[in-house]
Regions:
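Short, hydrophobic beta-strand segments
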Residues: 36-41, 134-153
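Beta-strand-rich extracellular modules
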Residues: 51-53, 163-167
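Beta-strand-rich structural segments
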Residues: 49, 86-103, 109, 159-162
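Edge beta-strands of extracellular beta-sandwich domains
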Residues: 55-67, 168-177
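Exposed beta-strand face motif in extracellular beta-rich ectodomains
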Residues: 42-46, 88, 154-158
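Short aromatic-acidic-glycine turn motif
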Residues: 25, 69-73, 111-128
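Short, small-residue-biased leader/transition segments that mark boundaries at the very start
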Residues: 2-9
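Long hydrophobic segments that form regular secondary structure
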Residues: 10-59, 76, 95-98
Length: 178
């Protein structure tokens, strides 16, 4: 059995696996501050729902079982950068063949930048990681990392590429304008 805890968002909560109830409605535990269920592990989408007294869902949070790491997915907060020393943030994720983030992934990602920009750093948010954040290689933490890209004053297209052994790589393109 595995324990699946949830924090309080309402007085009652239930647990669903692929839309079917696997954890009956439970009240908030004043002593621990946590509602939890012990259930056998099964692959799928696990959803905790905070409910009112009538059983209507008021809030919820889902996680999905992932497969093996397959590819790198990158999403930028913007694709047009105006001016010198403007910073863009790129969220980099290791995903399975279905596009689900592999939370257990700790792959090392290499970043290269082409064009009028430079890599400021890579950050995985792992407090125990003492590696150089300004290096162009970094391990993902819980399947994710954040890349900081800064313009260098020129105009044109910027390509930011992400690669890792055995994973399908990706790239993000920016347009730099003055």
């Amino acid at each position: 059995l595995h324990s699946f805890p949830t924090r309080r968002s309402s007085d009652l909560a239930r647990l669903l696996l692929d839309g079917k109830v696997v954890g009956e409605m439970k009240p908030y535990d004043e002593k621990t501050g946590i509602i939890y269920w012990d259930i056998p592990f099964r692959v799928g989408e696990l959803r905790a729902e905070g409910c009112d007294k009538e059983g209507n869902a008021l809030s919820g949070y889902s996680i999905r079982t992932s497969g093996r790491p397959y590819a790198i997915c990158a999403t930028a907060d913007r694709t047009i950068l105006s001016g010198d020393r403007v910073t863009a943030h790129i969220t980099v994720e290791v995903v399975d063949e279905e596009g689900t983030v592999v939370k257990l992934g700790d792959n090392e990602i290499t970043c290269t930048v082409e064009g009028p920009a430079r890599l400021l750093g890579l950050e995985g948010s792992d407090n125990s990681d003492m590696s150089d954040y300004t290096d162009n290689r970094h391990r993902v933490y819980h399947g994710r990392l954040l890349a900081y890209i800064q313009t260098t004053g020129g105009e044109g297209q910027v390509k930011v590429k992400f690669a890792s052994p055995l994973l399908k790589g990706t790239e993000v393109k920016f347009e730099v304008r003055q």
